[in-house]
A protein has these predicted regions:
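Adenine nucleotide-associated cytosolic modules
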Residues: 2-252
Length: 252
């Protein structure tokens, strides 16, 4: 009889502990939903000027611990990490190139990360666009990337733009960032980004991937050559292939 009582007491303790843990999980889920809700409120900010980043002069103990493996690199060091924390990058295109670019910039500790894309997540994206998930099919790609990166590094400021860049909004958005990363597969957008970066005096890093090949080029660095310098006129539409038509392998 005493043995049965002990077992019942242990069972009750386990039930109480399980109930406690479930309550903690529910609280964490509510906190996560609230954070993601706050993040989603930033998707319509095309006319809103971003506040300047809060300048960091030294690294916190937490930052030193987080970034310790890259801090020991003489090419980066504490000075480089502080510069990174005080810098901003705008990624245009939240697909196969935008996803890995975003996750590594976030992990490295960039101060502000903007993500521009007009599209929503589709099932056909998931084999290569690694920050999107099955349960986010139908969500805006920019929001999906911001959500994933926020879970990786909440110390970075994420600014998702669910829109298509055009001649009206490109310059106001681009002007607020230090560097622009072109991760699109659209020739017209490449020329638009190039022209806006030249006007705004921003460096443009341009990447492309098709089938089994990839390219990476830096334009307008310290007033160097731009994309239009190399290709003054856009190619005929029938000569251009994108990922939807030509395919792309899902391995970086």
């Amino acid at each position: 009889m005493n043995f049965d009582i002990v077992e019942m007491d242990e069972l009750q303790l386990l039930k109480d502990e399980l109930s406690k843990r479930n309550a903690e999980i529910a609280k964490l889920k509510m906190t996560l939903q609230e954070k993601e809700k706050q993040l989603s409120l930033r998707t319509d900010i095309t006319k809103e000027a971003l506040k300047p980043l809060d300048k960091v002069n030294k690294l916190s103990n937490e930052s030193i611990s987080r970034y310790s493996r890259q801090l020991i690199l003489p090419e980066l060091g504490v000075t480089g990490q502080v510069k990174l924390t005080n810098s901003s990058v705008l990624i245009v295109g939240a697909g196969g190139l935008g996803c890995p670019s975003a996750v590594y910039l976030a992990a490295a500790g960039i101060g502000r990360l903007g993500i521009v894309d007009y599209d929503e997540v589709e099932l056909s994206n998931l084999h290569r666009q690694i920050l999107h998930t099955e349960d986010r099919v139908g969500m805006s790609k920019s929001q999906s990337i911001a959500t994933s990166c926020h879970r990786l590094n909440s110390g970075v400021e994420y600014v998702p733009y669910h829109l298509a860049l055009n001649s009206s909004n490109a310059l106001p958005i681009i002007s607020q960032y230090d560097i622009v990363l072109d991760a699109t597969d659209n020739v017209a957008t490449r020329y638009l980004l190039n022209d806006a970066c030249v006007i705004a005096g921003k460096t443009l890093v341009s990447g492309s991937a098709l089938r089994f090949e990839g390219q990476l080029t830096v334009y307008n660095y310290e007033n160097g050559p731009c994309y239009r310098c190399l290709y003054p006129k856009p190619p005929p539409p029938q000569t251009v292939t994108n990922c939807s038509d030509g395919g792309v392998v899902g391995v970086g």
